[in-house]
């Protein structure tokens, strides 16, 4: 007796899990057995195929955001991008560990994204791909950022790794395409720097796909009116990207280097600010109680000045020094503050200067590219704007050097102050003072007096911030993210070079000299530099974006479904680019007779070329239980579908008359049978693309498909959504409650247990069986059985015709065609 599963076992369950939070998005890695999920709690999760084991989770936070709207993998599978609606941010995350490698803000919440890789080959591109990046030879490797500061700086703090190279990935151009509300569409080279802003498209983007040959961009949008949505398909020409691909690749590579370096400089400044605030907090914590409890009207500065001049401390100051601070505590505090000062100094020397010099190098190379007007002027690259950006970077380097001099001066004063105070406290305790510590020159006294003047000057404007009683204004004023002038700018009196420049009108206006802003902070000059660089690199994005012209507009259908917007994230339509045949495919459903019928629209990526069978609808007829020779016939509605690979579509169907728990099917639909060259002339769309397709259902050719393998009944699960991965040969099915996940290996057959009498059935079941496009009637089957057996007896099997619940007992032989 044959024991058989409930359907032909083409797919094997390899993992199943009930998740605590509702899943709103899931997408397989293009290269690994990993699947990324986003849930309603704002978490991004990474799971492995084996038992659906969780690898890591990226929790929501204030910096990035809490409302994830979509996910996309970089084509090499090493980076994951996700969009956040509440902060309007895009975050790039390393697959190895949770953490933001790079993030940037966009103008509108992103509703969909697509990350593609260019597959076009040419001799110019090949030489560029193979050429070693000269910047690796000419520029020193950027120092890693210290790990003991904020988590935002950890992306550049990994030992023995180059995070910028990890961000940039392979030299081959890849583009992250973002779509959002109000026709918002932007293209980011290497997922980092904007190279195009598309205009002229109305509505909210539901899906988009940039072809791998860079010839066209497909977009599906919806425009809501009177409680319903009009869904339309657009195809835009992107010939400028295609025609200037080598130039776009070189330019984009430079853009992303510049973008990563700006982030590196920002993070270096963040670390410097944290080191500065650490000094303030440590001193403030010691002085606050003293100021609150002292009975005298003198200031902290006066108390220390009195001790310096007369060698005698007031009772309040002596209590502060001996009871709250102590000699041991002073020594520890001095070491800690000196360490913070040294950290700021080191960050300026090794990080700010290195990053700025690298930035200067890449901008200079970009200026060289812009000088080749024949190649780069059509892309909007402007040499004059880049020259202005180079000048702004030079000003930033000058300001960083100025800060370095201020830090060096403050360090001298700081060391002199703590040495003097240490000796004073030893005398108060009548401890022995070493002779070398007891010596104090007039210069040392001047340093101490300067330290007291600079750092203990109570500033009312600081009372609501850190540094109320102790401020490091000479250093801190450079790190404040404000537009105010410096409180104590550097003294330029007697500086012969400065005086010479001020008196020479020719040199003041010379493009060879970087402008100097003596009264502005480092943060101000940095912001100015960023704005100028952004403006300089914004022009190519505008030029390329305006070149993308709408070539095709096809109204698809009117959607009146009142579903939760979160659940719509999974819904049709679904776009796919076949890189081999250069075709755009669009999967969508049309409501007909209360059923959702799947339609496939395909267009050539080259707008000037046409394709046969451009629109076809699929009707699912019957499913054969090959091991029991039974047929499942019913009425099926398409719930979800995605491309598994270039040749196959994975579909989730609902049996509208099946009983609960046995009414969902997972199906693999080969496109080779949908687009059969032998009868393609019979399946031509006879309507017009200028009218909504759901109003022309009768004009859409419908092919009825009947399956004998590559399908499975999804028992005990209200399957609703599917995500397939042809590279790893897996699919993930999600239930309608968005919590129940089941993972299948799609190309592995389950083993069956057979008794001795089942040899014949086993042999028949192992024969390759094709998917039928047409079920024969009983009379046709009887007439053709003998002839078919004579011609090819191995492809004739017996099939029982049953109702949807398999109750009929009539049987007939059936020829598989």
Swiss-Prot record:
Task: Tell me the first and last residues of the signal peptide.
Answer: none
Q: Does the keyword Cell division apply?
A: yes
PTM sites of type Phosphoserine = 757-758, 777, 779
Which UniProt keywords are present, listed alphabetically? Cell cycle, Cell division, Isopeptide bond, Mitosis, Nucleus, Phosphoprotein, Ubl conjugation, Ubl conjugation pathway
Q: Name one GO cellular component term.
A: nuclear periphery
Source domain of life:
Eukaryota
Q: Where is this cross-link: Glycyl lysine isopeptide (Lys-Gly) (interchain with G-Cter in SUMO2)?
A: 772, 798
Classify the main location: nucleus
- What Pfam families would the database entry show? ANAPC4, ANAPC4_WD40, WD40_APC4_C-half
Q: Which residues form a coiled coil?
A: none
**Which residues in this protein are found as Phosphotyrosine?**
469
Q: How does it assemble?
A: The mammalian APC/C is composed at least of 14 distinct subunits ANAPC1, ANAPC2, CDC27/APC3, ANAPC4, ANAPC5, CDC16/APC6, ANAPC7, CDC23/APC8, ANAPC10, ANAPC11, CDC26/APC12, ANAPC13, ANAPC15 and ANAPC16 that assemble into a complex of at least 19 chains with a combined molecular mass of around 1.2 MDa; APC/C interacts with FZR1 and FBXO5. In the context of the APC/C complex, directly interacts with UBE2S.
Q: Which PANTHER family match?
A: ANAPHASE PROMOTING COMPLEX SUBUNIT 4 APC4, ANAPHASE-PROMOTING COMPLEX SUBUNIT 4
Q: What does this protein do?
A: Component of the anaphase promoting complex/cyclosome (APC/C), a cell cycle-regulated E3 ubiquitin ligase that controls progression through mitosis and the G1 phase of the cell cycle. The APC/C complex acts by mediating ubiquitination and subsequent degradation of target proteins: it mainly mediates the formation of 'Lys-11'-linked polyubiquitin chains and, to a lower extent, the formation of 'Lys-48'- and 'Lys-63'-linked polyubiquitin chains. The APC/C complex catalyzes assembly of branched 'Lys-11'-/'Lys-48'-linked branched ubiquitin chains on target proteins.
Q: Report the sequence similarity comment from the record.
A: Belongs to the APC4 family.
Record protein name field = Anaphase-promoting complex subunit 4
Organism, scientific name: Pongo abelii (Sumatran orangutan)
What gene codes for this chain? ANAPC4
């Amino acid at each position: 007796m044959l024991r058989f599963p409930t359907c032909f076992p083409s797919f094997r369950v390899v993992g199943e899990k009930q998740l605590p939070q509702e899943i709103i998005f899931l997408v397989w890695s293009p290269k690994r057995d990993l699947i990324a999920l986003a849930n309603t709690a704002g978490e991004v999760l990474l799971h492995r195929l084996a038992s659906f084991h969780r690898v890591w989770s990226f929790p929501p936070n204030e910096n990035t955001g809490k409302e994830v709207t979509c996910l996309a993998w970089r084509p090499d599978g090493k980076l994951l991008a996700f969009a956040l609606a509440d902060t309007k941010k895009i975050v790039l995350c390393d697959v190895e560990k949770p953490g933001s490698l790079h993030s940037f803000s966009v103008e509108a919440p992103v509703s969909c994204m697509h990350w593609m890789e260019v597959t076009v080959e040419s001799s110019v591109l090949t030489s560029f791909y193979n050429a070693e990046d000269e910047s690796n030879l000419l520029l020193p490797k950027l120092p890693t950022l210290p790990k003991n500061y904020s988590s935002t700086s950890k992306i550049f703090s990994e030992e023995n790794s180059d995070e910028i190279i990890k961000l940039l990935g392979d030299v081959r151009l890849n583009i992250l395409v973002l779509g959002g509300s109000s026709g918002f569409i932007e293209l980011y080279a290497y997922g980092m720097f904007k190279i195009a802003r598309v205009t002229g498209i109305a509505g909210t983007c539901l899906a988009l796909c940039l072809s791998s040959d860079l010839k066209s961009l497909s977009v599906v949008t919806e425009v809501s009116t009177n409680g319903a949505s009009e869904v339309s398909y657009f195809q835009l020409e992107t010939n400028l990207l295609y025609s200037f691909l080598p130039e776009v690749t070189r330019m984009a590579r430079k853009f992303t280097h510049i973008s990563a370096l700006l982030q590196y400089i920002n993070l270096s400044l963040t670390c410097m600010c944290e080191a500065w605030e650490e000094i303030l907090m440590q001193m403030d914590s010691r002085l606050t109680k003293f100021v609150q409890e002292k009975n005298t009207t003198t200031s902290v500065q006066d108390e220390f000045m009195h001790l310096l001049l007369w060698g005698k401390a007031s009772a309040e100051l002596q209590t502060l020094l001996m009871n709250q601070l102590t000699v041991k505590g002073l020594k520890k505090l001095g070491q800690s503050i000196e360490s913070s000062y040294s950290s700021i100094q080191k960050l300026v020397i090794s990080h700010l200067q290195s990053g700025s010099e690298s930035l200067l190098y890449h901008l200079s190379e970009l200026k060289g590219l812009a000088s080749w007007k024949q190649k780069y002027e059509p892309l909007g690259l402007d040499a004059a704007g880049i020259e202005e950006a180079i000048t702004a970077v030079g000003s930033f380097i000058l300001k960083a050097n100025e800060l370095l001099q201020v830090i060096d001066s403050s360090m001298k004063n700081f060391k002199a102050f703590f040495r003097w105070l240490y000796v004073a406290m030893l005398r108060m305790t009548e401890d022995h003072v070493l002779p070398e510590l007891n010596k104090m020159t007039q210069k040392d006294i001047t340093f101490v007096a300067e330290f007291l003047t600079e750092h203990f000057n109570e500033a009312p404007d600081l009372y609501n911030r850190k540094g109320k009683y102790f401020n490091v204004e000479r250093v801190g004023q450079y790190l404040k993210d404000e537009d105010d002038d410096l409180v104590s700018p550097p003294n330029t009196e007697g500086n012969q070079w400065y005086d010479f420049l001020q008196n020479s009108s020719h040199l003041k206006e010379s493009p060879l000299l970087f402008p100097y802003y003596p009264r502005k902070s480092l943060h101000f000059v940095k912001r100015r530099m960023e704005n100028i660089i952004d403006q300089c690199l914004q022009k190519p994005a505008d030029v390329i974006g305006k070149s993308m012209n709408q070539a095709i507009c096809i109204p698809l259908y009117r959607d009146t479904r009142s579903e939760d917007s979160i659940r719509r994230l999974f819904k049709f339509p679904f776009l796919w680019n076949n890189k081999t045949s250069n075709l755009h495919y669009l999967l969508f459903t049309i409501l007909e007779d209360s059923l959702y019928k799947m339609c496939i629209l395909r267009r050539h990526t080259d707008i000037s070329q046409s394709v046969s069978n451009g629109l076809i609808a699929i009707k699912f007829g019957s499913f054969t239980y090959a091991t029991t020779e039974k047929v499942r016939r019913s009425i099926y509605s398409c719930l979800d579908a995605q491309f598994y690979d270039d040749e196959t579509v994975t579909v989730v169907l609902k049996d509208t008359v099946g009983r609960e728990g046995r009414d969902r099917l997972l199906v693999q639909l080969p496109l080779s049978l949908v687009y059969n060259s032998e009868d393609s002339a019979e399946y031509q769309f006879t309507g017009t693309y200028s009218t909504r397709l759901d109003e022309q259902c009768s004009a859409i050719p419908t092919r009825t498909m009947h399956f004998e393998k590559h399908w499975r009944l999804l028992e005990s699960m209200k399957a609703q959504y599917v995500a397939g991965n042809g590279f790893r040969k897996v699919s993930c099915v999600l239930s309608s409650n968005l919590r129940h996940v089941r993972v299948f290996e799609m190309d592995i057959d389950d083993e069956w247990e057979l008794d001795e009498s089942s040899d014949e059935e086993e042999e028949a079941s192992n024969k390759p069986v094709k998917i039928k496009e047409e079920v024969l009637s009983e009379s046709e089957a009887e007439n053709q059985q003998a002839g078919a057996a004579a011609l090819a007896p191995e492809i004739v099997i017996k099939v029982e015709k049953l109702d949807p619940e398999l109750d009929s007992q009539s049987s007939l032989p059936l020829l598989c065609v």
